[in-house]
């Protein structure tokens, strides 16, 4: 039988995690850490910065334990900039055209969270402008993910805690699974699109061609699309919330059947759906 002290300890830990997450999503940054021994404040919160010139690569694989991840298409060079608690937390290598980056805390049996007035640990990857990446795989635990100006064939992004931001990106196939955080995609063009979100708002501005599927448990979904309404078949439904198409509020499940190849499916448990089409 679980002792009273154990129950109290578990409750306090859960409360600490909840408060830390609230602080993080309110704009806070890393300060309190947790490992198998419990909560602690790191003795050194100063970030170590380093820049690495990289050889060319065609695919990207990122496994991120903590910190923000940013990929930018800019200039003519392949480059990696890092800001982490310890330089040993970041490793990278290129094998058969695939760049693999891993960021892991020194105490690998724990995880990190917290809030305070600190700069965010981060990795920032630069690829030459107009480069088309074959495949991108990102598995991120804590931290925001941002992609700017990138072209890719396939992207698979798994994000546990943190916001996701895309700007001016083009992809043949995009798959995103997010647990906690908002998703904002601006100037996006995709030919196949899948989003699974548990908690957070979804805001997309761009063109969704082919089969596009969005499912969410909690949060609103807003789509400002450049597609013509007559070219898109759609199936929009929310269990608790409103559905609006081109500023016209409708109730229940809203569908349109077309013979074309472009299909949009949005299914929410709790939240509003707002879609605008040309």
Listing of model-derived features with the role each one plays in the protein:
Residues 1-65, 70-74, 132, 246, ...:
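Alpha-helical transmembrane segments and their membrane-interface anchoring/capping motifs
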Residues 24, 32-33, 40-43, 58-65, ...:
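A broad, low-specificity signal for short, low-complexity segments enriched in glycine/proline
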Residues 44-59, 68-77, 90-177, 182-186, ...:
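Right-handed parallel beta-helix
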Residues 85-87:
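Short, polar loop motifs at secondary-structure junctions
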Residues 168, 174, 183-278:
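Short, surface-exposed interaction patches in beta-rich subdomains
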